[in-house]
């Protein structure tokens, strides 16, 4: 139990702090721990000894800037220098040498690997140690097992069979007697019997033959090896046999690590020192003792809850990077050994630096890390859709990945919410689909103890001293500590001092929820939001929503696109400011001073006699193709303080998160256009750029050298292409900045040389060569063309040339996208929908003051979904809009009084009605609703309608990126079927369901044509167009279509031969033909 330094004070920790703390632990401790494990490398004759030292290592400043690393597709890394010693004969050399580069974390808590922002997700795994469980077999007999989990994730099981014999199951197939295992680990029979509580059970099952096998350690090891490796015959004890056992079994299944040793000691009441990180015979015997106690009723029947957080540990960025560093050092060791052998062959004098500087050795470190970031499932591309995603991504915890669960095999129980999650892992925020419950998000106050890997949550201590002094101390409890405390829920208020004794409060104790007297409480929650993640904490009136809809909302807020003109919400929760601040999309003043000048690229600040240039991000592409842009917010000559906002990023206003827009909504059906969650919108949202967003797409092309050795060329001189397609190219063949480009336009002109044979030259080419001696170009045009849906303005062109023949050109195109039919919009309560129709503003329903509504939602989407929070939000938003107020409401306001949310909303509506002198704003007969009029006829609607100002987001699922059609396109070379997918211009025209529809109408000839001649009959599909145009008869080919050939080949692969016969109509003669 840890106390916080500031007694009685509790602030929300920095949301990116977890990533920074993890990386700092890796740099300060992880590197040293791995360097200490690096062995002294000696040659066989012991003439050379090479050693690295853990003390005094240094990391240099990165040689390139972060922005250049992104543009030039490089890795943002720092060079690591380590002290090394080389003994060569009698000569001893000490030197600080460079062993390679290590990726460095930037200010966002991410890494830049090959120009791409990547982040490492925290993994949550079963902690190493021992876990007991009992289960009934098919006959109803209780089976008791103890599972030992190593630090590597290897598992071994201890079990008692029907004959009361004790076995250790070291793999799925092999089980070994517990006596053989203990003896192989170094104990003799006398030591075993002296160290167990039930020696009679151990003595009951070995017969004379088995006792002989464990007479000595060598015999026990041979017996263990025979059973483990399933090897027969007479084996001879040897060092290589021991090394193989050490590598295959003991290292993988018996290394507990620091955390495993602590858990083993705690579970079995042992006092083995913490530095003993391997499984000892004493551990195995104590574990067996406990199992016997469970079986024969002398012990406590306590199954371990594998889903309790006390039995889990977090593998943070520190652990994963440290593992990779250890792996790289192992490779470095092998490389140095090879170099030493070469030294003897060449008979040259080595130095510490020359042993590690050959090209392959010096890049070992960085290539290991690049492979890790590129292939490891928890090293993900950083989600930069909006500031919220940037903050939330680093706080995710995942049960997936190496050593963890998989989406297909995880049980319901492992996905479920556990009482130990409260205040640590958000019960709401998880992914939808196959990984539901397997990826979660840390609660906003949770922190990770990086030493033990546990998640801690803060509480106020309610001790007698604290009560007397009237002060509160903040304590952080780990999951295995809070079981011993009575914890009052955070949504209960402090009690009235006078009647404390009589009052009872809801509390949590040992995973149960109770109602107990106030004086029995030990600690209480510090904040109503304490249980939720950032996504859940941004939902106003979350307590009025169904949990499934809150889950959808926290996921959809991460998909919101930054709009061209951001607007902060009228109704919020108060967490918007810190979320925006910790995303680091805004520029914050690091010192006080005076603004000299500001423009869209930089701000010049004068501070303490120095002029500081602060660069701004101008229209930079994010990983999700959204536009990142910073707008200066301080005029020239203004004095600023430290911590003040100098420039705002995308989707922030006034330092607060601003993902959507406050729009006037009505909940009513409208001619069926909002059936099944569809949304009707006004054209005002299009013409006034309310929901207009900017997107930046990147297109790149690279030159290469062909197999004949000739280089590709970037040029404007491309034969056989229309001038219209080349209109935007400059003299180098690259598109000009500021050009407007359409689908199919050439962005970069490129020619690939081809070798043509003499016979393939046309006659004119021979003539030109004979008369003028000119060679005709046989280059192939391989230019970069703008694909479908890519039209826009060229805002940047990057020309990266690593050598004369290796050139990469990147073109960035900015697109302006207004909201349109097919785009997805959503509120903050899981109320999502697709735009079905854009109405002229004069046709939209209008209020009694003549204001037309902006959006019409379906009211049937509320009762069944039980997300009533949207109703409170829209009504309070209307009041706030009329009163020019903004509200920041904490959840669970019913702790103040019953119906507190409704009372607040109605009182504000009444106040707005009074101040604006609009009685329709609050009508007592139907509060929150109002009579509104049909814009087409001017008649009032039959029923009063709920109207309000809701905060609605535009999501990244946009119709421009999804709509697709195909008339003709590419076919698969193998099956001759149309290819799949929008990216390949594919699309199967007639599928299974279309065939059913045609069968239903009995159109046999159309069906035959569509499935054969017009689809995949190679010759017929060429001829059929001609026949259709000239009105000829359809060709009737006797050979089968390609789909039939594919079927035949698939049957052949199953060893089934399908023969194809043609039967003559005249004489029924059978002619066999090969398919």
UniProtKB/Swiss-Prot annotation:
Record field: catalytic activity: RNA(n) + a ribonucleoside 5'-triphosphate = RNA(n+1) + diphosphate
Entry annotated with the keyword Transcription: yes
Family note: Belongs to the RNA polymerase beta chain family.
Keywords for this protein: Chloroplast, DNA-directed RNA polymerase, Nucleotidyltransferase, Plastid, Transcription, Transferase
Protein name: DNA-directed RNA polymerase subunit beta
EC number, UniProt record: 2.7.7.6
Subcellular location: Plastid, Chloroplast
Organism the protein comes from: Zea mays (Maize)
CC per GO annotation: chloroplast; DNA-directed RNA polymerase complex; mitochondrion
Main function: DNA-dependent RNA polymerase catalyzes the transcription of DNA into RNA using the four ribonucleoside triphosphates as substrates.
Top EC class of this enzyme: transferase
PANTHER family: DNA-DIRECTED RNA POLYMERASE I SUBUNIT 2
GO biological process: DNA-templated transcription
Subunit and partners: In plastids the minimal PEP RNA polymerase catalytic core is composed of four subunits: alpha, beta, beta', and beta''. When a (nuclear-encoded) sigma factor is associated with the core the holoenzyme is formed, which can initiate transcription.
Single GO MF annotation: DNA-directed RNA polymerase activity
Gene from which this protein is expressed: rpoB
TM region(s), chain numbering: none
């Amino acid at each position: 139990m840890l106390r916080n330094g500031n007694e009685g004070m509790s602030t929300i920790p920095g949301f990116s702090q977890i990533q920074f703390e993890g990386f700092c632990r890796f740099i300060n401790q992880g590197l040293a721990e791995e360097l200490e494990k690096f062995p002294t490398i000696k040659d066989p004759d012991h003439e050379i000894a090479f050693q690295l030292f853990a003390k005094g290592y240094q990391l240099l400043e990165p040689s390139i800037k972060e922005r250049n690393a992104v543009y030039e597709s490089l890795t943002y890394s720092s060079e690591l220098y380590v002290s090394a010693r080389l003994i060569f004969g009698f000569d001893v050399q000490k030197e600080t040498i460079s062993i390679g580069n290590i990726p460095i974390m930037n200010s966002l808590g991410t890494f830049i690997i090959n120009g791409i922002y990547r982040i490492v997700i925290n993994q949550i795994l079963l902690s190493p140690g021992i876990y007991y469980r009992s289960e009934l077999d098919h006959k109803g007999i209780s089976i008791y097992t103890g599972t030992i989990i190593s630090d590597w994730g290897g598992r071994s099981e201890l079990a008692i069979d029907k004959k009361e014999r004790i076995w250790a199951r070291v793999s799925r197939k092999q089980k070994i007697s517990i006596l053989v295992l203990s003896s192989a680990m170094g104990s003799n029979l006398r030591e075993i019997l002296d160290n167990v509580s039930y020696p009679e059970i151990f003595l009951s099952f070995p017969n004379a033959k088995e006792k002989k096998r464990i007479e000595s350690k060598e015999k026990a090891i041979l017996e263990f090896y025979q059973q483990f490796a399933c090897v027969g015959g007479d084996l001879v004890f040897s060092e290589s046999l021991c090394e193989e056992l050490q590598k295959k079994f003991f290292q993988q299944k018996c290394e507990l690590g620091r955390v495993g040793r602590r858990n083993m000691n705690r579970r079995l009441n042992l006092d083995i020192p913490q530095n003993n990180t391997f499984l000892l015979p004493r551990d195995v015997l104590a574990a067996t003792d406990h199992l016997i106690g469970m079986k024969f009723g002398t012990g406590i029947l306590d199954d371990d809850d594998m889903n309790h957080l006390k039995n889990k540990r977090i593998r943070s960025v520190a652990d994963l990077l440290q593992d990779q560093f250890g792996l790289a050092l192992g490779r470095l060791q092998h490389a140095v050994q090879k170099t030493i052998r070469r030294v003897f062959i060449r008979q040259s004098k080595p130095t510490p630096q020359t042993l590690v500087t050959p090209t392959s050795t010096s890049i070992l470190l960085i290539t290991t890390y690049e492979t890790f970031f590129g292939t490891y499932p928890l090293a993900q591309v950083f989600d930069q859709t909006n500031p919220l995603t940037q903050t939330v991504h680093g706080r995710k915890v995942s049960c997936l990945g190496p050593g963890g669960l998989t989406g297909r095999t995880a049980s319901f129980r492992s996905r479920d919410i556990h009482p130990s999650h409260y205040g640590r892992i958000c019960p709401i925020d998880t992914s939808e689909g196959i990984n539901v419950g397997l990826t979660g998000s840390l609660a906003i106050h949770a922190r990770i103890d990086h030493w033990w890997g546990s998640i801690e949550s803060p509480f106020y201590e309610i001790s007698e001293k604290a009560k007397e002094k009237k002060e509160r101390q903040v304590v952080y409890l780990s999951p295995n500590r809070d079981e011993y405390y009575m914890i009052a829920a955070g949504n209960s208020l402090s009690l009235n001092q006078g009647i404390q004794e009589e009052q009872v409060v809801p509390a949590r104790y040992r995973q149960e929820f109770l109602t107990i007297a106030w004086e029995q409480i030990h600690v209480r929650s510090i904040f109503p939001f304490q249980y939720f993640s950032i996504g859940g904490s941004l939902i106003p009136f979350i307590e009025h929503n169904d949990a499934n809809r809150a889950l959808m909302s926290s996921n959809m807020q991460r998909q919101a696109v930054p709009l061209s003109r951001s607007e902060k919400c009228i109704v919020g929760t108060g967490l918007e400011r810190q979320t925006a601040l910790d995303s680091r999309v805004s520029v914050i003043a690091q010192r006080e001073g005076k603004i000299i000048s500001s423009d869209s690229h930089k701000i010049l600040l004068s501070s303490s006699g120095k002029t500081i240039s602060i660069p701004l991000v101008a229209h930079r592409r994010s990983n999700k193709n959204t536009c990142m842009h910073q707008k200066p917010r301080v005029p020239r000559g203004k004095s600023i303080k430290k911590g003040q906002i100098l420039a705002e990023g995308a989707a922030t206003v006034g330092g607060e998160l601003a993902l959507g827009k406050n729009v006037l909504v009505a909940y009513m059906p409208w001619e069926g256009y909002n059936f099944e969650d569809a949304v009707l919108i006004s054209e005002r949202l299009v013409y006034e750029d309310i929901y207009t967003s900017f997107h930046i797409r990147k297109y790149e092309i690279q030159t290469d050298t062909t197999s004949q050795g000739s280089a590709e060329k970037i040029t404007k001189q491309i034969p056989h292409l229309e001038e219209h397609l080349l209109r935007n190219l400059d003299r180098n063949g690259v598109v000009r900045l500021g050009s407007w480009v359409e689908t199919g336009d050439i962005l970069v002109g490129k020619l690939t040389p081809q070798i043509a044979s003499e016979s393939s030259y046309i006659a004119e080419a021979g003539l030109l060569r004979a008369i003028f001696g000119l060679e005709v170009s046989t280059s192939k045009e391989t230019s970069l063309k703008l694909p479908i849906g890519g039209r826009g303005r060229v805002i940047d062109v990057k020309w990266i040339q690593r050598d004369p023949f290796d050139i990469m050109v990147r073109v960035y195109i900015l697109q302006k996208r207004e909201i349109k039919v097919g785009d997805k919009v959503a509120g903050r309560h899981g109320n999502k929908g697709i735009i079905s129709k854009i109405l002229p503003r004069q046709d939209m329903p209008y209020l009694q003051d003549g204001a037309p509504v902006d959006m019409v939602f379906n009211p049937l989407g509320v009762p069944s979904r039980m997300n009533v929070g949207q109703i409170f939000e829209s009504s309070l938003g209307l009041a706030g809009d009329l009163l020019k107020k903004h509200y920041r409401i904490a959840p669970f306001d019913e702790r103040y009084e019953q119906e507190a949310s409704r009372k607040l909303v109605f009182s504000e509506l009444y106040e707005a009605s009074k101040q604006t002198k609009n009685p329709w704003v609050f009508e007592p007969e139907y509060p929150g609703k109002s009579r509104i009029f049909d814009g087409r006829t001017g008649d009032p609607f039959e029923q009063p309608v709920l109207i309000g100002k809701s905060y609605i987001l535009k999501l990244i699922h946009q119709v421009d990126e999804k709509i697709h059609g195909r008339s003709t396109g590419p076919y698969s070379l193998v099956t001759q079927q149309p290819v799949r997918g929008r990216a390949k211009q594919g699309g199967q025209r007639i599928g299974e369901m279309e065939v059913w529809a045609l069968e239903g109408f009995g159109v046999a000839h159309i069906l035959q044509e569509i499935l054969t001649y017009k689809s995949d009959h190679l010759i017929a599909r060429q001829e059929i167009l001609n026949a259709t145009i000239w009105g000829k008869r359809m060709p009737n080919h006797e050979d089968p279509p390609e789909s039939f050939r594919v079927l035949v080949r698939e049957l052949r692969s199953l060893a089934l031969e399908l023969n194809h016969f043609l039967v003559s109509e005249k004489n029924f003669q059978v002619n066999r033909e090969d398919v």
